[in-house]
Amino acid sequence: MTATPLHWSDTAHEVLSGDLNVAVAYVTPAGGAVVVSVSPLGLTDRAAGRIGFTTSLGFPRKLERILRDPRVALAYHTREHGFARPEDYVLAQGDAVVDMRPSPQRLDDVLDASDRFFGPGKSGRAWDWLLHEYRRARVYVDIDVRRMATWPDLAAYGPPEVTGPAWPDAPAEQRAPENGTAPRVDVARLSRKIDPLPYRLLAYRGADGYPVVVPVEIVGRDHTGFRLLSPPGLLPPGGRRAGLLAHSFRPQNVGLAMMTFTGWLTARSETEACYAPHTSTALAAPPNRTVQALGNGILAKHGVWRAGRDGTGERLRTLAGQQGPLGRRES
């Protein structure tokens, strides 16, 4: 953990401990950012200045990128179906440490937290076998929080209250990719898929290397991409690689739907931008808790089997063994 743990407010702590679904962003080797949704289950250690979430070996690319560059950000952007009451938008930036082999006690703690947020888990001989990898082959991602920014409303308008290092200046404009900045996927088709997903967040790499995640509205589209609106002061000028997330979820996280994009962001003003998507990935869970649990179990079993067969698990464990005290890889 950090030498001097960051201490955050009671309001922020309620949000960190109570949100059902948050956005997690990590940086890419090309200087962009990817943003996805996770359920952190209120995993916080306030005294240590640490937050976290768990994930599966079934998502190795996310883990590998975090292991190679541990600078991450978590955006607590909605109170829907959670336990927190404040209407603050909270952005936590920090350094991740990946625990590839959590202790049995840590895994038991996750199960207890899961019961609180997702409802009592399935049990019985068949379910225990099916969900073994989903429950016991988890990977812990701990984040030592370096900076926390809090806005007084979920739309993130106005100046933030910053705990930790001062908010950095806007990052420099990036060089356009060799293949150009225009959309590489069907914008009209993707727009129709995004329409039912109410939560939209944009992520880019900040000037100090940590991801910045901001809420945006998608207010239109044309041949150049999606037209975005953002609160004043949160869009960096110029063009750059960026990630976009659109997602939705129901109580106990049933029926989770998520679309993630990588692409090129061009700011047109302090509040308006064009986002040209280059890649897209979709995930949708069935709106039935039993069917979703069945799918989780099958996917986790397959992910663990595949990670063992193709060497992914060993490669990730090797990278994890090279982590420094703040997640930095040791040379």
Language-model features: locations:
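N-terminal leader/targeting segments and the immediate start of mature chains
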Residues: M1-T2, S9-H13
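Charged, gly/pro-rich active-site loop segments
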Residues: T2-L6, F83-R189, L229-S331
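Short amphipathic alpha-helical segments and helix-helix/interface helices
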Residues: A12-H13, L63, L131, S191
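Short loop/turn motifs at secondary-structure junctions and domain boundaries
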Residues: E14-D19, R192-L197
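Short beta-strand segments
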Residues: L20-G58, L74-T78, A84, D88, ...
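Short, solvent-exposed aromatic-acidic interface loops
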Residues: T55-P60, T279-L283
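A short, hydrophobic beta-strand micro-motif
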Residues: D69-L74, R241-L244
